[in-house]
Amino acid sequence: PTAAPPEETKPVQPAAAAKKETPAQPLEAQENASEKKIGINLASRILTLYEGDTKVKMYHVGVGKTSTPTPTGYYAVQYKEVNPTWVDPDDTSVQIGPGPSNPIGYRWIGFSGNYGIHGTNHPESIGGYVSNGCVRMNEADVEDLYQYVSVGTPVTVYYDRLVIDVDPDHTVSYYVYPDGYGWQSLSVAQVKKALAGYGVEDFAEFQDISDKINASDGNVTYVAKAYDLVVNGNKLAKRALGKNGQIYLPSVAVATALKLDLQWN
């Protein structure tokens, strides 16, 4: 059988060949010129790199075990390190330098005390609740992420089982993830309310949503395409919806905006 991977901890000192990047001034005084930021959803176990509000990269990650969950909150990258040395959290005299035996891989992106984003020599653990609270990434992924972020890059860690996406073609879709930490119950009414914010709640049937919550498999559910409606220069609160090649208009809202007498035949 394969031995369990050693538990990670922040390297207390860099290896001889390590390259370390630390802030030259307080984090609040630094400007993030690229406007890049990191979002980590513990429920989906996905790390997203944003530029402004645009998603530019998404990576699967491993996060804290149920007994040692990754803390949620608002943070910032505090320091970065190439070729970190792993230090045994139970015996600091035990250390593993850079190389294939190092459980935190070849990159460390610290964002809060002992917590950081790092590589791993156990890629099979990615996607699970596996760590002492750090965020594990596949080595190729963390090396990719490392080049895009800098000290001061904002890091938001959160736990959302329901994720709603809007594609460039206006398609609204949602995902329901399992409650790995047991932190967040989810009801049909909550999903409906969230979809209402995108104007597509009427195209999501009660039973379909209930089935998705019961499955909690993280698979995508496409709802409808949503388009803004402008009448006489005014954007309506209701939206035009597209489904199966058909466009549906909110007739009452359009008639009211046009000051027409709407009659049903």
Residue positions per predicted region:
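Low-complexity, acidic Ser/Thr/Pro-rich repeat tracts that form intrinsically disordered stalk/linker regions
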Residues: T2-E28
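A structural motif detector for short, solvent-exposed N-terminal "entry" segments of globular domains
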Residues: A24-T66
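Short, charged beta-turn/beta-strand-edge "cap" motif at the junction between a beta-strand
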Residues: D53, N83, R161-I164
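Primary recognition of N-terminal secretory signal peptides and signal-anchoring hydrophobic helices
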Residues: D208-N265
